[in-house]
């Protein structure tokens, strides 16, 4: 994961200090890309320990089309707590847009089901896209989508995925996003009887919050460890039937966790 450390270093060296919605302040750069060969290991950051339970359960929660944090709370995941209302609701965030994008005639579109079918029936399509950026519902969301749009690509019987992340909290959020979309790529590949190729992360406003700079510098002093591999223990009937127990990150070794405050 030297690629990720290079992003931290790039922001520390070239970032411009900017104000932000949370009032915390950031060092920011605009436009950055990282590529991960999924055949060479699963891209979990090793220079600090990641909470893999949160990564897996959050993705399963998205795939359910869920927008209430009760499922996350039941499974010990607290990463969305700060944005939920008193009933645990977040408004029409990722899961709603992925699974039930509203149409003008009152219907809905299951973007994920559609894209899986397209990959199976027309893998050379250039329209293998899922978007969470629904302009008509942004004002109803507790947090507008940071990871806004992703696209699949099939070549040589291998599946790649590229994510566009408009706003990237590089210390806390991006390691989760890399792992989450890499996991999704593995799952979709299994459902479509494909091997995995690359996960490509493209960021817009890539920033370190000013109260994360010391933590980022600490992380840069640590030597990356070998990447783990991902084992998926069964192939369920659909993309939406996976369970937490189906996944194992084999030989995940890491340096200790580094705590940092979240900007709300």
Curated annotation (Swiss-Prot):
Active site: 146
Annotated residues for binding of (6R)-5,10-methylene-5,6,7,8-tetrahydrofolate: 51, 169, 263
Single Gene Ontology BP annotation: dTMP biosynthetic process
Catalysed conversion reaction: dUMP + (6R)-5,10-methylene-5,6,7,8-tetrahydrofolate = 7,8-dihydrofolate + dTMP
Database matches in InterPro entries: Thymidate_synth/dCMP_Mease (IPR045097), Thymidate_synth/dCMP_Mease_dom (IPR023451), Thymidate_synth/dCMP_Mease_sf (IPR036926), Thymidylate_synthase (IPR000398), Thymidylate_synthase_AS (IPR020940)
Pathway: Pyrimidine metabolism; dTTP biosynthesis
Subcellular localization(s) per the UniProt record: Cytoplasm
Keywords: Cytoplasm, Methyltransferase, Nucleotide biosynthesis, Transferase
E.C. number: 2.1.1.45
Binding-site list for dUMP: 21, 126-127, 166-169, 177, 207-209
Broadest EC class assigned to this enzyme: transferase
Listed GO MF terms: thymidylate synthase activity
GO CC annotation: cytosol
Acyltransferase in keyword set: no
Oligomer and partners: Homodimer.
PANTHER family named among the record's database cross-references: THYMIDYLATE SYNTHASE, THYMIDYLATE SYNTHASE 1
Similarity annotation: Belongs to the thymidylate synthase family. Bacterial-type ThyA subfamily.
Function: Catalyzes the reductive methylation of 2'-deoxyuridine-5'-monophosphate (dUMP) to 2'-deoxythymidine-5'-monophosphate (dTMP) while utilizing 5,10-methylenetetrahydrofolate (mTHF) as the methyl donor and reductant in the reaction, yielding dihydrofolate (DHF) as a by-product. This enzymatic reaction provides an intracellular de novo source of dTMP, an essential precursor for DNA biosynthesis.
Name of the protein described by the UniProt record: Thymidylate synthase
The organism of origin for this protein: Legionella pneumophila (strain Lens)
Lineage: Bacteria, Pseudomonadati, Pseudomonadota, Gammaproteobacteria, Legionellales
Gene: thyA
């Amino acid at each position: 994961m030297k690629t990720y450390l290079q992003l931290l270093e790039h922001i520390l060296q070239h970032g411009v200090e900017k104000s932000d919605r949370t009032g915390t302040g950031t060092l920011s750069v605009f436009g950055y890309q990282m590529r991960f060969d999924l055949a060479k290991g699963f891209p979990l950051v090793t220079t600090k320990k990641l909470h893999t339970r949160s990564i897996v359960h959050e993705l399963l929660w998205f795939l359910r089309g869920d927008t209430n944090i009760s499922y996350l709370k039941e499974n010990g995941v607290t990463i969305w707590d700060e944005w939920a209302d008193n009933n645990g609701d977040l408004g029409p965030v990722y899961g709603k847009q992925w699974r039930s994008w509203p149409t003008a005639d009152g219907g809905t579109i299951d973007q994920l089901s559609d894209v899986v079918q397209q990959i199976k029936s027309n893998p050379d399509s250039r329209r293998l896209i899922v978007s969470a950026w629904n302009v008509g519902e942004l004002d109803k969301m507790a947090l507008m989508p940071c990871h806004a749009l992703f696209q699949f690509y099939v070549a040589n019987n291998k599946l790649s995925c590229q994510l566009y992340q408009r706003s990237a909290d590089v210390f806390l959020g991006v390691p989760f996003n890399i792992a989450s979309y890499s996991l999704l790529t593995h799952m979709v590949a299994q459902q479509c009887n494909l091997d995995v190729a690359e996960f490509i992360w493209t960021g817009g406003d890539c920033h370190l919050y000013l109260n994360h700079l010391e933590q980022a510098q600490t992380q840069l002093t640590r030597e990356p460890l070998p990447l783990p591999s991902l084992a998926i223990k069964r192939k369920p009937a659909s993309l939406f039937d996976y369970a937490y127990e189906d996944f194992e990150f084999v030989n995940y070794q890491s340096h200790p966790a580094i705590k940092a405050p979240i900007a709300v």
